[in-house]
């Protein structure tokens, strides 16, 4: 029982870190718990995706699909405070030009939005909107399943990067020091377990094995790209690059899912 309560505490810590949702007072906080909470990132993603799916379904009863998709995306941005989108913009600004590692890290710490960051945000969010619109228009139920699945599985990717790459910045002055520490094998296994459970749930709800395979391959391909890109350019990861990886892999999930239902 104590172990289950502790895991619930870790989930709430992750939920509090990544969303605006208030958590019970008994949850508490320590840097060690914050670090260990990484195993539950996909579960937080499933919760966010569930909200997105609910908003999409409700909005589609009242407005055209394009408006419903926009409101669904806006709901997730509000719910998470644009946490991952901010990381995407900073990463695009830092790595968009041919600058040195040190210069890239300095640019990524700048709170101002540059041209590469703006282009990255518009490109990724625009493609997500188009993919979700086409998927919803093709099969609304598949779109709802895909939303929850993509939000969950894409959040397993930052956990993998925490395990596979070293921290590229100054760990002592990191905004979230626990994120500057490597995740254990057990933590990564737990996160991947949540991702596997998301796949099983999606299949049980009607997603085909072919569609899931297409979406999963998209996520894996983008995750592998991020690992290689971050290692070459920065020698590791930063908090911003983790957010960028989540956004890119979420987009890859939608595109893969759409390809799966389109060609099946």
From Swiss-Prot:
Membrane topology reported for the UniProt record: Multi-pass membrane protein
Spell out the subcellular localization from the entry: Cell inner membrane
Species for this entry: Leptothrix cholodnii (strain ATCC 51168 / LMG 8142 / SP-6) (Leptothrix discophora (strain SP-6))
By which gene is this protein encoded?
Answer: cobS
Q: Keywords assigned by UniProt?
A: Cell inner membrane, Cell membrane, Cobalamin biosynthesis, Magnesium, Membrane, Transferase, Transmembrane, Transmembrane helix
Q: Which domain of life is it from?
A: Bacteria
State which Enzyme Commission number(s) the record gives.
2.7.8.26
Query: What reaction does this catalyse?
Result: alpha-ribazole + adenosylcob(III)inamide-GDP = adenosylcob(III)alamin + GMP + H(+); alpha-ribazole 5'-phosphate + adenosylcob(III)inamide-GDP = adenosylcob(III)alamin 5'-phosphate + GMP + H(+)
Its GO biological process annotations read: cobalamin biosynthetic process
Required co-factor(s) are: Mg(2+)
| UniProt pathway annotation | Cofactor biosynthesis; adenosylcobalamin biosynthesis; adenosylcobalamin from cob(II)yrinate a,c-diamide: step 7/7
Xref: InterPro entries: CobS (IPR003805)
What does the record give as the organism's lineage? Bacteria, Pseudomonadati, Pseudomonadota, Betaproteobacteria, Burkholderiales
Residue ranges crossing the lipid bilayer per the database entry? 10-30, 43-63, 113-133, 141-161, 183-203, 205-225, 243-263
Name under which the protein is recorded: Adenosylcobinamide-GDP ribazoletransferase
**What is an example of a Pfam family matching this protein?**
CobS
């Amino acid at each position: 029982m104590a172990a289950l309560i502790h895991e619930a505490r870790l989930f709430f810590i992750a939920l509090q870190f990544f969303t605006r949702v208030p958590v019970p007072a008994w949850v508490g906080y320590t840097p060690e718990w914050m670090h260990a909470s990484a195993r539950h990132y996909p579960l937080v993603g499933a919760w966010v995706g569930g909200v997105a799916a609910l908003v999409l379904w409700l909005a589609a009863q009242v407005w055209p699909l394009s408006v419903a998709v926009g409101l669904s995306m806006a709901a997730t941005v509000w719910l998470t405070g644009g946490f991952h989108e901010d990381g995407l913009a900073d990463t695009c600004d830092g790595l968009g030009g041919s600058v040195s590692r040190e210069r890239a890290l300095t640019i990524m710490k700048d709170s101002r939005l540059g041209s590469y960051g703006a282009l990255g945000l518009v490109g990724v969010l625009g493609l997500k909107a188009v993919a979700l619109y086409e998927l919803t228009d093709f099969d609304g139920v598949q779109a709802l399943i895909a939303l929850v699945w993509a939000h969950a599985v894409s959040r397993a990717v930052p956990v993998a990067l925490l395990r596979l790459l070293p921290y590229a910045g100054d760990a002592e002055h990191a905004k979230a020091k626990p994120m500057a520490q490597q995740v254990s094998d057990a933590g990564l296994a737990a996160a991947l377990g949540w991702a596997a459970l998301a796949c099983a749930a999606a299949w049980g709800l009607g997603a085909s094995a072919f569609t899931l395979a297409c979406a999963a391959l998209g996520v894996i391909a983008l995750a592998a790209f991020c690992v290689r890109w971050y290692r070459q350019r920065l020698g590791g990861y930063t908090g911003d690059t983790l957010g960028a990886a989540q956004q890119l892999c979420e987009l890859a999930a939608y595109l893969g899912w759409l390809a799966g239902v389109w060609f099946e």
